[in-house]
């Protein structure tokens, strides 16, 4: 996906015949159309940041390593783990399905700023594909919250006898802090996409004000796209650490074990 739009970025206007063979509706004459270019950037950013780096690092390794390194038989709630997995699976299916709907997938960039995301008819990717993006992200957030709560409860309640908080491996500390950051920040993004859905479907104007299309003013007033930016980046800034901390925790254990030297100061 990233290779396709980077080819067009590196060689603007250049025709690549294999693109026409691979995706004839997206790249007529071997040149990726502008709206499909934006759609690929949006999908790539969303999948990499949320579905791979967030769920892949935190979700996968937390479930594997937290019980193993704490001496617990399993996670605190197997039922919550199951719900988290199936919400994530459903979210992934909906995100992939958005590629095949009329108008194509969401095309507002992975940050989905209004007004492109708030007006269903703004651009081809603002239609059903954008709606599916919002639904997919809402389910992903529910999955992330269920998993994070499970990790926190497991760390606090299921440590083996004699393992105090100060004796936990740094990997577990990284997963714990990541889970706390997720519980504090993901609900804000959930509220942001919920209000965005209201703007799209129910005629509200949380993010819309003084919008003109083809010289005609829309009947929306009182909102501001900046509100969405504030809500989105309330998650966006902690998201950096949600992505980074699990990798740092794992690296600290791998380096300390293979160098046969304890972590300095811990």
Sequence positions of predicted segments:
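Membrane-embedded and interfacial regions of multi-pass energy-transducing membrane proteins
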Residues: 1-266
């Amino acid at each position: 996906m990233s290779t396709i739009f980077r080819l067009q970025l590196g060689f603007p206007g250049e025709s690549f015949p294999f693109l026409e063979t691979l995706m004839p509706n997206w790249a007529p004459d071997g040149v990726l159309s502008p709206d499909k270019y934006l759609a690929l950037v949006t999908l790539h950013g969303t999948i990499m940041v949320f579905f791979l780096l967030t769920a892949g690092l935190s979700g996968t390794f937390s479930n594997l390593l937290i019980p193993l390194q704490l001496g617990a038989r399993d996670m605190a709630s197997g039922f919550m783990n199951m719900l988290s997995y199936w919400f994530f699976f459903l979210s992934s299916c909906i995100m992939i399905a958005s590629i095949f709907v009329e108008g194509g997938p969401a095309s507002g960039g992975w940050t989905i700023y209004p007004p492109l995301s708030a007006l269903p008819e703004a651009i081809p990717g603002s239609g059903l594909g954008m709606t599916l993006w919002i639904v997919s992200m809402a389910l992903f957030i529910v999955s992330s919250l269920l998993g994070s709560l499970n990790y926190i409860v497991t760390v606090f309640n299921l440590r083996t006898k004699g393992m105090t908080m100060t004796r936990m491996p740094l990997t577990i500390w990284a997963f714990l802090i990541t889970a706390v950051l997720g519980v504090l920040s993901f609900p804000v993004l959930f509220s942001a996409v919920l209000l965005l859905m209201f703007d799209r479907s129910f005629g509200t104007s949380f993010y819309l004000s003084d919008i003109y299309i083809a010289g005609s003013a829309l009947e929306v007033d009182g909102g501001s796209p900046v509100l969405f930016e504030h809500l989105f980046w309330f998650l966006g800034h902690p998201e950096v650490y949600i992505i980074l901390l699990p990798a740092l925790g794992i690296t600290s254990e791998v380096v300390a074990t293979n160098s046969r030297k304890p972590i300095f100061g811990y």
